[in-house]
Amino acid sequence: MRQSGRKSNQLRPISLELSPLINAEGSCLIKIGNTHVMCSATCETTVPPFLRGQNQGWITAEYGMIPGSTSHRIKREAALGKQGGRTQEIQRLIGRAMRCVINLQKLGERQIIIDCDVINADGGTRTAAITGSYVALHLAIRSLMKKRILKVNPLISQIAAISCGIYKGNAVLDLDYLEDSDAEVDSNFVFACNGNLIEVQGTAEKEPFSEEQFLAMLKLAKSGVVELFKLQNQVLIAAE
């Protein structure tokens, strides 16, 4: 039995608040249980040096946790003078994921920066950030098209992500912090809406896990992202 009382295939309560930030082209506050992440997408008319003159766009991401997002205050990385390895890993993951669902040539010579700020952390912050960032990106593209900055929609797919793990010997979906800190296996799955995988991260915390356990987690993850895709579509259609 999970401490939260949830079934093994049950997500935490989820909400997506659209456009909480008035200045970004697109923004979304995603809440999955007690994990809350502010995601925004901002467009710039410059691209990285390696893309100048290529008539191609770029998407990059930044990720951070505010000091009061966990039980013990986190020092601001800006105050420390450098980003931690975890931060760099997660923001690269978010950037890679977003680039998988957009035609960079159709984006033109401009860059969209995804910013993810964890307001409250209770497990699954990186997967929540990806799911919320897609919504922010979608809204940003919609805004650019309404302004006729873009003539063709460069989005080619939809993206969502969820965590799974082996907890007390069982495959479970959407781990919270208590489960994650005591799980035998911790994994993250990033999906396109056609069911294809974009990225998989999996780590055995105590002992190696079997192919059977991996497939059990994959099955749970696929069922979970279906719900996430439905919610993304519902809120985006309602905001048209």
From Swiss-Prot:
Organism from which the protein derives: Rickettsia prowazekii (strain Madrid E)
NCBIfam families associated with the record: RNasePH (TIGR01966)
Reactions it catalyzes: tRNA(n+1) + phosphate = tRNA(n) + a ribonucleoside 5'-diphosphate
PROSITE patterns: RIBONUCLEASE_PH
One Pfam family linked to the record: RNase_PH
Job description of the protein: Phosphorolytic 3'-5' exoribonuclease that plays an important role in tRNA 3'-end maturation. Removes nucleotide residues following the 3'-CCA terminus of tRNAs; can also add nucleotides to the ends of RNA molecules by using nucleoside diphosphates as substrates, but this may not be physiologically important. Probably plays a role in initiation of 16S rRNA degradation (leading to ribosome degradation) during starvation.
InterPro entries: ExoRNase_PH_dom1, ExoRNase_PH_dom2, ExoRNase_PH_dom2_sf, PNPase/RNase_PH_dom_sf, Ribosomal_Su5_D2-typ_SF, RNase_PH, RNase_PH_bac-type, RNase_PH_CS
Protein name (database record): Ribonuclease PH
PANTHER family according to UniProt: EXOSOME COMPLEX COMPONENT, EXOSOME COMPLEX COMPONENT RRP41
GO biological process, one term: rRNA processing
Sorted UniProt keywords: Nucleotidyltransferase, RNA-binding, rRNA processing, Transferase, tRNA processing, tRNA-binding
Domain of life the protein comes from: Bacteria
Enzyme Commission code(s) on record: 2.7.7.56
UniProt-recorded Gene Ontology molecular function terms: 3'-5'-RNA exonuclease activity; tRNA binding; tRNA nucleotidyltransferase activity
Family note: Belongs to the RNase PH family.
Assembly, per entry: Homohexameric ring arranged as a trimer of dimers.
